[in-house]
Amino acid sequence: MIQEEYKKNEEYMNSTILPKLQEIQREVLKNPSKLTLDISVRNNDGEGYISSFACVRDFAGEITDTCYPRFICVYSKEEMDELINELDEFIKKYSA
C-alpha cells in the first residue's frame, strides 16, 4: 500500500512538479535579477526526491534571502503543491 502511494506521488512529481520547476527556471533565466535557482533530482531505492534552492543576492553577492523546498515521494500532492507555490511566490517577489 505504501509503495503504491509513493509510486503515485513520484508520478505526480514527474508529471506536475518537474514541469512547474522548469517553467520557474525559464522565468529566472529570462528576467534579469539577483536570483539563483538550483534544482536536483534523485531516486534512492525507489523513493523519488527533488530538492530546489533559490536565493537572492545583494549588490556585493551576499545571500539576503533563501527558499529551499524539497519534494519527497512521501509528501502528499497537496503538500507538494504548497511547496511549489511557496517557491513561485519567492521568485515573483524578487523578480519584480
Residue ranges and their predicted role:
Residues 1-47, 63-96:
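Negatively charged, low-complexity tracts enriched in Asp/Glu with abundant Ser/Thr
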Residues 50-58:
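Amphipathic beta-strand/beta-sheet edge segments enriched in Tyr/Trp
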